[in-house]
Amino acid sequence: MELKGKKVLVAGLGVSGIALCKVLDSLKAKVIAYDEKEYDVLKENLEEIKSLSIDFRFGKFKKEFLEGVDLVVLSPGVPTDSDIVKTAQEKKIELLGEVEFAYRFSKAPIYAITGTNGKTTTTSLLGEMFKNTGRKVYVAGNIGYPLIYAVMEAAEGDFIVAEISSFQLETIKEFKPKISCIINITPDHLDRHKTFENYRDIKGRIFENQREDEYTVLNYDDPVTWSLKNKAKCRVFPFSRKSLLENGAYIKDGSIYISVNGNAEKIIDIEEIYIPGEHNLENALAASSVAYLSGISADVIANTLKTFKGVEHRIEFVDEINGVKFYNDSKGTNPDASIKAIQALKTPIVLIAGGYDKGSEFDEFVKAFNGKVKKLILIGQTAKKIRDTARKYSYPEDDILFAGTLEEAVKKAYESAKEGDSVLLSPACASWDMFRNFEERGRIFKKAVAELRR
């Protein structure tokens, strides 16, 4: 793609947008960087690009921002029904999403992972499997390292493992992974995608350009994910925790097996997998399937599963103070993710929850408390909504506390906990009402726990 001298507008100046600006500048494009937020809000983000020859625009979108523009590249956070998108379409200006734009530069094959929950763990785990073969691998995408950086660095013989979100899949055109994977699909981001059916179909776009010599790996146990198989024009490879499969990855006699064309091979005994929980078994099956189909040996897969310790902010053990364990699950940004965290812990739980309202319902989340959650400490925009749902299912009002800050929530949680309990931050909500992102929320939680020792 020749961009020298072309006028390119980057919409959205988060992590991806900043990366796009840097790469476009290096490709000698004339870059316009736009965000609806004002400069003062974005000042910190813009530090690394402020010295580049970029034309910055902030605040409410104006049609003249697109005057003479050849290409608009959208960051994932910019909705497809926004004014900038509608205007670009009216003016017939080429419009590419960040992932689509990056894909067009890629020399290396991309192994793409999506799903509502488990994406980051599965992507990281798969990246480790590639790394442990001695291959040069880039782990990128929604995981925090922009895909555009990875494709610019990766050579033809390298590999890219990418976590891909529904926001990124909305705008693909030619994007075609070597192997794709959908771990699961449960309601999320309905404030953006409007209906669950829309959300499901956008997730299914991950394999829409793959053909018969390529694979998509799908969760056989999840009816919503498995229903997408009929749309696939490529080979479908299932994984299951519950059923024996003639062709796919499955559990038999306490071990993971993978069978391709009827030839089954044992990978590992489940008890040898380092990261705990049923949801992590699902992640292990998904990552192992993609690795095996890409030619990675059973030995390398097994050794990685024995040593991989999980990812930051996902049921991350933080500390134990006076017999009370603290876990950071700030990555629990929807009810289903937080249900999995509650299920993974075997002790009584003091739960810190609440945050930005994405339009989720919390009925299943509250039902999962199941006698395990002894105190509920609520923060953020959804605090009252979760409280009302908890009361609907007769959760004791005396066991529900509110906190104005996460630091206050941690203090209240510690005061409420006894030796043998776990304090779990698993908000079941996004972080944007109080924090820049879930990483910041997780770091503040860990700092607040450390303060308890002072």
Curated annotation (Swiss-Prot):
Catalytic activity: UDP-N-acetyl-alpha-D-muramoyl-L-alanine + D-glutamate + ATP = UDP-N-acetyl-alpha-D-muramoyl-L-alanyl-D-glutamate + ADP + phosphate + H(+)
Keyword terms, alphabetized: ATP-binding, Cell cycle, Cell division, Cell shape, Cell wall biogenesis/degradation, Cytoplasm, Ligase, Nucleotide-binding, Peptidoglycan synthesis
Organism: Thermoanaerobacter pseudethanolicus (strain ATCC 33223 / 39E) (Clostridium thermohydrosulfuricum)
Functional note: Cell wall formation. Catalyzes the addition of glutamate to the nucleotide precursor UDP-N-acetylmuramoyl-L-alanine (UMA).
Location within or outside the cell: Cytoplasm
Gene Ontology cellular-component terms listed: cytoplasm
Binding site for ATP: G115, T116, N117, G118, K119, T120, T121
Name recorded for this polypeptide: UDP-N-acetylmuramoylalanine--D-glutamate ligase
Family from the record: Belongs to the MurCDEF family.
InterPro entries: Mur-like_cat_sf, Mur_ligase_C, Mur_ligase_C_dom_sf, Mur_ligase_cen, MurD
Entry-linked Gene3D superfamilies: Mur ligase, C-terminal domain, Mur-like, catalytic domain, NAD(P)-binding Rossmann-like Domain
Recorded metabolic or biological pathway in which this protein acts: Cell wall biogenesis; peptidoglycan biosynthesis
